[in-house]
């Protein structure tokens, strides 16, 4: 009788272990790590970028698209060279310089160097700085500008 009780107890413990293991595997949650935030140093190095939208030329909105290469220095400065097409004309080798500011929540703003004729942008940093998604905040143009780390 004692042997039968011991055998039953061992079987019950083994079955409980198997069920617990199966339930734990089936319903396990993904590991989530705390985000450490962003800073100007999040953006460093070369990024390819493209922009698309509309530019106001002589009180008429015309398509304005382009692409280029930008370099972020990790300290709040960015310089770029780009090509664009607007309203049937195109241009290459155009410079753009700006300062940028990054908040700890990964919001970013780019402010064109005064007198450069460039636009200002606001947006967000995603994937630990691998991408930057922005929109033009300089009236009256409507552009999206997206960067991808090279």
Could you describe each region identified by the protein language model?
Residues 10-24:
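Bacterial N-terminal signal peptides
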